[in-house]
Amino acid sequence: LCILTAIIKHPSFHKMEKSILAKLNNIIFLHINKISDYYKSEFWFDSNHGVFHALAMLNISQIYKEGPNGIDVKEIGVEYLKTSLKGILSIEEGISLEQSSYYHQLGIELVESIDDSYLQMIGINKNEFIDRMILANYWFTSFENKLVPIGDTSVISKAAKQHVLSDEKEKLKTFTHGGLTVVKSKSENNTSYFAMLHRKKRGPHGHFDALSVVLEKNNSRFLIDSGGPYDYGSEMRYEYFMSSYAHNVLLINERPHQKGAIFIGSRQMNSDVFIVEAEHK
C-alpha cells in the first residue's frame, strides 16, 4: 500500500489508462480488506508486522478515506498502530518486547520513522524514548557491541555504534516486563556477561521455551540461545531458528518446556556473586 500510495500521488498517475487505474483500485481495496481482517483477528498485535500493516493503512488513507464495505481506513490504521506499538514496546522499560535483541535494534529504527503525533497517542515522546532504547543497549550488548544472542538473533549480529552510547556502574539489570536479567562486568580488555530469560510467555521471534541462559567470559561465549550462525537474508537462518528450541535449557523428564516462566528475583551478593531466580510455570 505504501508503494501504491506513492504511485497514485505521482503527477503522471492521471495519465494512466483507465484499465490500469481500475486494476490499481482493485489491488488497493484487496489490501485494505486484508489488513482490516488482520486487525480484527488480533493475530499481529504483538509483532512489528502489525505496525507495518497499520502504517500502510495510514499511508493509503491520504487518498482513500473509505474502503470497501464502508471501512474507515484511517481509523483502523490509527487504532491498529496504537495497539501494535503497545504490543511490541515496553513504555515503562524503554525496550522492545519482541524476544530478540536484534529486534530491539529494529525497534529503534521503527520508532524513529513514525510521526510524533501517533507516538504521543500512546504516551511516547519520540526523542526521549529512543534515548532510553539506546541506553538499554548497554545491557543487550557484550564486547565489541555484539548483541546478546537471544531468540532470532544471529551470533554475529552487532548494534550500530551510534546506538551504544552508555556506560553503567551497576552490574545487574532486570527487565521485568521484557523478561530478562543481565549481569555485565566490564574491564579495559574484556567483558564478562550473563543473561537469563524469564518471560511469562514466548514473544515474537523467540524460541519456544523458557529460562534459557547466555554466558560469556573474557570475551568468549560458552552458552548461547540464538538464531544460529546464519546472517539475515540467508534461507538457512529462518529454517534453523524455527526448527530449534533454545540450545541450553534443561529438559525436565526428557521433555522441553513451552509454558513460559515466573520471575522470582535477582540480587547481588557481593562484588562477584549474583543470584537470579525464576521457575517454569
Task: Identify the function of each model-found stretch.
Residues 1-130:
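Aromatic-lined, polymer-binding surfaces characteristic
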Residues 97-281:
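Extended polysaccharide-engagement surfaces of secreted carbohydrate-active enzymes
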